[in-house]
């Protein structure tokens, strides 16, 4: 099944965002952090689900908190740790209430950074111990598992490491889960399925000098959930998928596998609509 992220639209009001998708006859929606805080989000989602047959997934930062913060399930900061866990528990509660099938969260970061730095240059900070952060993440992730209904799957999305941030941290990686080796190491401690973000992986592979095709194929063996976008390999640009591109060919190689795809493509509406058209053809 193919979903479209709320982030594909510039409209940040939840009701107006969903109203636009309704006009486009798109009813499989991934809810994520581009939306503004909305007190009545449950009522709105119930309305679209029951009246119009919408299907929802939740990604990372939804429901939107009143005060923005950088969600990090591995942070050593006790205040941010509690906020991160509490927000994820709200997400899981919503999944349980609305019978949603998937909730995905970002892999942890080894530094605490501001929301204004997300997807941009991250100011250099002291990098925490990977072992310590993984231990905290394991505790939090296992806690979340206790609250999900049996038919709700939890996923962890691979982070994106740009060359700029890699060099800014003196060629040390301030993020977790930016390669398949990271996944292989993490799953020795934490049992989880990855959400494979193609755009994130493409940039990380360029930065770390890894073979993107090989990394994609390795990840795809361990997941049934892929977030789709393309870029120039240097920046996570959230561009549309084009026929004949490398990502198109890799997705085509999975056409016989029953995956869930989420489109996170920015810019003009035509961009994500073109990508949705391609995915619909691939997954007939």
Identify the meaning behind each predicted range.
Residues 52-54, 101, 150-152, 256-259:
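A short helix->loop->beta-strand "cap" motif at the edges of active sites that frequently abuts
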Residues 48-61, 140-147, 180-189, 248-254:
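Alpha-helix-loop-beta-strand connector modules within alpha/beta enzyme cores
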Residues 74-193:
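Active-site acidic/histidine proton-transfer and metal-coordination neighborhood
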Residues 6-9, 34, 81, 170-174, ...:
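Short, flexible loop segments at the rims of nucleotide/cofactor-binding pockets, characterized by
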Residues 4-5, 28-30, 57-58, 102-106, ...:
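A structural signal for short, well-ordered beta-strand segments and their strand-loop junctions
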Residues 8-10, 33-35, 62-64, 107-111, ...:
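Active-site-proximal loop/turn and secondary-structure-junction residues that shape catalytic pockets
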